[in-house]
Amino acid sequence: AGAYRVLVHADAQDNDHFRLGISNTGTKYTGQVRSSLTYVNNNISGMADTLGVSVITSPGHFSDVKTGAVAYRKLLPEMGGELSVQASYGKVNIDDMQPYPGLLDMDLSGKSLALDLHYRQFLTYTSRTKNILDFGIGYRKMRSDYGFSFSGTPINYRNDYRVILASIDFSHRERKE
């Protein structure tokens, strides 16, 4: 009397996920089509860590569009937090862009590198309330080259910078019922 018997059944799920995407988010100069391949494993070492890798390009303009990213997250239950690392790279070339042929001709290119390291401390982490303190450090390296020809007169410009970022962030989320 007053007793319950509960049977729980769990199915093993595949931790590997692949996705191939095709979209029309490009331009006429770098190809209208973008293709992406993404891989995510949400339990790579058997300890609920996550690895994600993604690459994007333009099939007809592979030499013009190359981007990629990798991310890894490691739960640290003994510390009540997690550590994450992200890296991304991008390279785009737009040659012979002629919005007004003979009057304005352009060649544009850019490269970017981003690296990030974050530690998140879970101050409160329940199904209803999440309070998280995030400490991060990042590095950015960007380079853009602009080549213009205005009525046959060449004008070249380069924008090149590197920056180190540091951040502290507090986030609070509360689920409403």
Give the role of each language-model region.
Residues A1-S84, Y125:
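Outer-membrane beta-barrel initiation region
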Residues H17, E82-E177:
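Transmembrane beta-strand segments of outer-membrane beta-barrel domains in Gram-negative
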